[in-house]
A protein has these predicted regions:
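Short loop/turn and low-complexity linker motifs enriched in small/turn-promoting residues
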Residues: 1-157, 183, 193
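Short loop/turn segments that connect beta-strands within the blades of beta-propeller domains
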Residues: 55-57, 140, 149-150, 188, ...
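Surface-exposed loop/turn elements that mediate protein-protein interactions on large endomembrane-trafficking
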Residues: 127, 152-174, 197-222, 238-256, ...
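Hydrophobic beta-strand positions that form the internal "hydrophobic ladder"
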Residues: 143-145, 192, 235, 272, ...
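Ankyrin-repeat and related helical/solenoid repeat scaffolds used for protein-protein interactions
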Residues: 311-356
Length: 376
């Protein structure tokens, strides 16, 4: 080989090394050539990734229709990397479960997270618990109180640990008859307050269901119109149907919403759910990443034409709610569309979510049903 040939070959390899060396380094650092740039975007950009955490474990992750990863067995999570900045369709699948799908944006040098994914079963199973139930209440301790009617009077019973225990009868309240209109639960004790109608007058009675023998005490000056609760240095007051909040370091209450049916704190104590006839909303007690909200902000999660009858938290990132003829579950991740699941179509359901058992109870047409465990 002549000296000239060796010089040419050496020059070629030197050129390739000069070009390829930095390119390899840039590639290892996550830089990619972006051929789909729009005006103002960089031709060479760093990639990003998606972090998925889902239950059940070992779900398949599809990105833009391609299987890219599977979550691990131990933690149910996976990191999928090396994506150019942009929007991607992400789908999480597992046999026997309904899929989760959302369009998520990946940014340069950032990891987009979806850490609260729950996949629900394709079929929901319910079992009949008891019949001939007129009304039902659920205690803060996650137990059930229900009212049954006999030919002569109503009976109030407690259902706990799969056992039914009679609490009291109509004649215990008033021998000539008393209409039970509501049960109010104490925020500080196990006491119950019975709201009754006797001779067309409202009368309230306090009793402790754990006390033996039973002792009823009439409350002469009870006012249930104002109910206050404190969470994370916020104080919430429900005055009639108005929900008000007193922020930390403030002496004044600010109205959040009118026509509020009920409000509930999330298990992580970072969010407050409240709902009206046609809206489900959240008040944030702390900063959150998903949804991206600051402490003290409000968010309308859902607006429905149907009448919303009740709502409960599932964990701290999903909500189960009922309408006049449906029970549904939805997430609170408001990036793209909400993943919403139809649980059952049923007439006028009264629902209760038992967080400890991870089971749903519903009352419909005087029959009380209980689900199998809903969470994976």
């Amino acid at each position: 080989m002549t000296k000239k040939s060796r010089t040419i070959i050496f020059s070629i390899f030197s050129f390739l090394f000069i070009i390829g060396g930095p390119s390899a380094i840039l590639y290892s650092q996550g830089y990619r050539l972006n051929l789909n740039t729009e005006e103002g975007e960089k031709l060479i950009t760093q990639t990003g990734g998606i972090f998925i955490k889902a239950a059940p474990r070992q779900v398949e992750i599809y990105i833009d229709g391609k299987l890219r990863e599977k979550t691990d067995f131990l933690f149910g999570s996976a990191l999928v990397e090396n994506f150019l900045p942009g929007k991607y369709n992400v789908e999480v699948n597992k046999t026997g479960y309904l899929p989760w799908e959302k369009t998520l944006e990946i940014k340069e040098k950032e990891v987009t997270e979806a850490k609260s994914i729950l996949l629900f079963p394709e079929e929901f199973s319910f079992n009949l618990l008891t019949e001939e139930i007129e009304d039902i209440w659920f205690t803060p301790e996650q137990t059930i109180i229900f009212k049954k009617a006999t030919t002569s009077e109503w009976i109030l019973s407690l259902y706990k640990s799969e056992e039914e225990t009679e609490l009291l009868r109509e004649s215990d309240v008033y021998s000539k008859g008393a209409k039970l209109t509501n049960i109010i639960f104490s925020a500080t004790s196990s006491d119950l307050i019975l709201e009754t109608e006797i001779a067309k007058n409202k009368r309230y009675f306090n009793f402790d269901p754990e006390e033996t023998p039973l002792s009823l005490t009439e409350l002469k000056n009870f006012n249930q119109e104002i109910i206050e609760y404190a969470y994370n240095n916020y104080t919430f007051k429900k005055e009639g149907e108005s929900l008000c909040v007193q922020s930390p370091n403030s002496d004044l209450f600010e109205k959040i919403a009118d026509s509020v049916k009920e409000f509930r704190i999330s298990p992580d104590h970072k969010k407050l759910l409240y709902f009206t006839k046609h809206e489900i909303s959240i008040f944030f007690l702390d900063d959150t990443i998903v949804p991206n909200k600051k402490k003290g902000e409000k968010m309308v999660l859902l607006r429905l034409s149907d009448n919303i009858t009740n709502c409960y938290w599932i964990k701290s990132n999903h909500i189960i709610f009922s309408t006049d003829d449906n029970i549904k579950i939805t997430e609170i991740d408001n990036r793209d569309i909400l993943n919403t699941v139809d649980v059952i179509e049923i007439k006028n359901p009264e629902i209760f979510w038992n967080e400890n058992e991870e089971k749903l109870y519903y009352l419909s047409e005087n029959n009380l049903f209980i689900s199998d465990t809903l969470l994976p």
